[in-house]
Amino acid sequence: MCRLIDDIAAFLEVNGFECSRQMRHDFDVICTKTLDGRYSRIIMPLEITARSREEAGLGSEEASYAIRMITSDSGYPLIITEDRWKRQRKMMEARLLAHLEVFSQAYARNCEVRRIDKTEAKAFLAGNHSYGYAACRYCYGLFLKRHTGHIAEETSDFGDIGKMIAVATFSNARKWVKDGKEIRSYEWTRYASLPEMRVSGGMGKLLKTFIKEVQPDDIMSYADLEWSEGEVYRALGFEAEMEKEAVDFVIDGETWERSPIRSGKEGNLFFRNFGSRKFRMKLTDYK
């Protein structure tokens, strides 16, 4: 059976990347550079072999330590877990290439935001977000309006004028009273773009539309530490608030479907993720 690291390295090499394998803090990683040689990247494949929650917890602790050490040396690694790679292969390949600067560029100024229904949001997120759809109240799509200043061709499958290239969803309001004033807080539940496309300014444009239409007092969201440290939220004006504990998952070793333990679904493998970081944007002054 082909090891995960072998499979990922073979994919990269077919796409023109030179790969070297190293042992970093007891984990096999792939070291590569963008095709232009300007940026180095560390890719950290994580095979899923734990047969119990306890074993998964120990593995998560060891991986978390390695991630912290690698980050201090070389920046946050791109973590690719075995279940994601095997169940969502096409999306993961495109996301991997995008991290290595192989993507089609679109700019928010060439796009328009429209409200979409939950059916449209669910279909898009199922194919382009690692966790798929989540319950929400407000759904927005980002649609390509014109081709200027980016490399997407009008004949490309993802560059068609009018095509939806990103989606953002938000919850209904959670309300509380502070100093006699009602505060309406919303969660930004999902954001995803087509994995092979980088939409410069896309998150910001969707967020600004939501703020303009709904006029929230407060917006919060979570950065999944399996993917990033959440720097994009800081760039948008959010502030980090707290760390959320890791979540235990059960995984079906045949389909590679990942489900939270609390879902009651069965599986023969276990995985504990790396938790998440909570971010908040206050749009009303309160303590």
Locate the predicted segments by residue:
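Active-site/acyl-donor-binding loops of N-acyltransferases
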Residues: 222-286
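Flexible loop/N-cap segments at domain edges
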Residues: 219
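Acidic-basic catalytic patches of nuclease active cores, encompassing PD-(D/E)XK
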Residues: 1-22
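Short acidic loop-to-beta-strand element that houses the catalytic metal-binding Asp/Glu
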Residues: 23-46, 139
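Catalytic cores of nucleic-acid endonucleases
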Residues: 55-88
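Short beta-strand-loop-alpha-helix junction that forms the active-site gateway
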Residues: 35-62, 173-175, 242
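A short catalytic or substrate-binding loop motif that flags glycine-/basic-rich loops and adjacent residues
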Residues: 22-25, 132-136, 161, 270-274
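A conserved beta-strand-loop-helix scaffold within acyl/acetyltransferase catalytic domains
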Residues: 91, 95, 100-215, 223-231, ...
